[in-house]
Amino acid sequence: MRKRILALRLGVAALSGVSVYLSYAPIGWWPAAIVGMALFYLCLAPQVSVRVGALLGFVHGLSLYLFLLPWIGEFVGNLPYVALAVTEALYSIAVGAGGAVLMKRRMHWAFPLWFVSVEWLRSTWPFGGFAWGRIAWGQVGGPLQYLAPYGGPALVSVATLACATGLALCLLRPRLLGAVLLVVPLALGGAASISRGGGEVGQVTVAAIQGNVPRLGLDFNEQR
């Protein structure tokens, strides 16, 4: 029975990663990030060990980055692409392990802060970090994007994770806290959009050309 439950948790964790991927361009369905992270937080309910939480985090991250980063394989080949996806997924181990602790202690409000702390580390270390996959990048077109002028992508990520945690808690307990975490960030984003004069006012087409990268392989970055 325990193996079946673990298998179910792993399946949901993988699905949560795919859901978060759907929020990024070119698909750009911003609610998918909220749904995906809510599914991931539900994987940790009612409580799991730190080891299981770490495993769930890795599966979530691996499914996300395998879908998000195939374009890298076009430049450096499939092996480096998979290696990068695995490396980035290692950071999600911390998300899952910490999330398991917070779920067990019912410190649900702290999960968004913990997630963004790990996201910051991944985006800055090592070698300047790798910021692809920040949860904020998937909120283009949604109300939470209007929070960016007040706190940058970190605030947008916190707001997204707050909504996700709130959605998960609406299916668990405490439902009142869940409703607050879900509604307040969306309301603030909506208010910020009104204060800034609404949505899009036009479109701009931009083209860029990168020259002198004629071949595949990791040495492409050495060319000038």
Residue ranges and their predicted role:
Residues 2-197:
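Membrane-embedded alpha-helical bundles of multi-pass enzymes
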Residues 194-224:
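Soluble catalytic regions of membrane-associated enzymes that act on cell-envelope
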